[in-house]
Amino acid sequence: MTEKKNTERQLTSVQEEVIKGFTTGYGITPESQTDAAALRREFLDDQITMLTWADGDLSFYRDITKRPATSTVAKYDVYLAHGRVGHTRFTREIGVAPISDPNLRQKTVNMKYVSDTKNMSIATGLVNNIEDPMRILTDDAISVVAKTIEWASFYGDSDLSENPDAGSGLEFDGLAKLIDKHNVLDAKGASLTEALLNQASVLVGKGYGTPTDAYMPIGVQADFVNQQLDRQVQVISDNGQNATMGFNVKGFNSARGFIRLHGSTVMELEQILDENRMQLPNAPQKATVKATLEAGTKGKFRDEDLTIDTEYKVVVVSDDAESAPSDVASVVIDDKKKQVKLEITINNMYQARPQYVAIYRKGLETGLFYQIARVPASKAVEGVITFIDVNDEIPETADVFVGELTPSVVHLFELLPMMRLPLAQVNASVTFAVLWYGALALRAPKKWARIKNVKYIATGNVFN
């Protein structure tokens, strides 16, 4: 039998080019699109896939009443108390009671200024686009301004400034600062329960309010629903063999009335450090942080916080930009009653003056850094800001705001409703800004309550 042998043919360079020629391939650049690939049309789907939040994710901004303002300072009166009640109102037969006046005070709210600026070259609008670039930029600016207003309505702080004068910061005060300090409940990392909601409703009721709404991250609402699954069962069956199980809790009947529950997908987003955010050229230099464990009796750390590295990062914020996060400062806590002292040194070399520092602590479950405090630059002594962490704010927890959402209790003053302003054109591009001027007014601080450090379903996929 003749044995067949496999022989390898050596091809010339010309033959190799002929064999390889006229295959379309996957190249998408002129250098890689040769021969048949040079004839291939590019395909771009005409649908843009949204991978971030949209207007529908905003709840508080959509629900709250907006009132016009006609000055940069809005004034309003608050009725704090009636006249005296009780024994002194009883009199003898021919007597009259002593004079007793009601207690009224005047409050003020300073308007603050929110804007977002966009720029687009003229050529961008002339080419064949799948969507109108100007419409995309305008919609994005409106969404950014609305989201900023909603975030500040919860967490804004007008004292975050290098100026020690009260209210000199750029932000307006939010609910976390305006709510009466006696109306703050600490869940200490536990789940939201019916008892906590009832306790909050009692606080609101003692302020002569009626709680109507509760705003919380969706992770808190989902955890609240999970607690009901073993106590309440709902099975919905169609005409066949299919069944749907589970339910959603949209409201709660408290001791003071019905409370609508709103689960937000974006409420806590700005409280989490985005370490991949691009730094602007005018951003402040990053801070230097030193963490020290100190003896004390005010610490409120939990068992799970002990014997592990507790890690901190700090971001320096100016009017226009944020610094890169500082290097990690860590300490091992060995006693729940102790406290952590952070010494934050602000770099003397900066292009923009720092206004405050944001302090973050690492969560145990996700590994993300959660904001635990913001300290104004006015608190610095010789360039060093000192902060004491006693676990007053726990990472990977959230806030629940419960209160009376009526125009007589809380609303937004609007000096300038949201508008689009064309800016000066100095080159072949179009620049515009979307503006909003106003502030949050909480006329009755005791008619709202805050439940802090509430457990929620934390996720690691927060940022794209």
UniProtKB/Swiss-Prot annotation:
Pro-peptide positions on chain: 1-20
Transmembrane parts of this sequence: 423-445
UniProt-annotated location(s): Virion; Host membrane
Keywords recorded for this protein, A-Z: Host membrane, Membrane, Transmembrane, Transmembrane helix, Virion
Major subcellular site: virion
GO-annotated cellular components: host cell membrane; membrane; virion component
Origin superkingdom: Viruses
Keyword Membrane set for record: yes
Membrane topology: Single-pass membrane protein
Name of the protein in its database record: Putative major capsid protein
Lineage start: Viruses, Duplodnaviria, Heunggongvirae, Uroviricota, Caudoviricetes
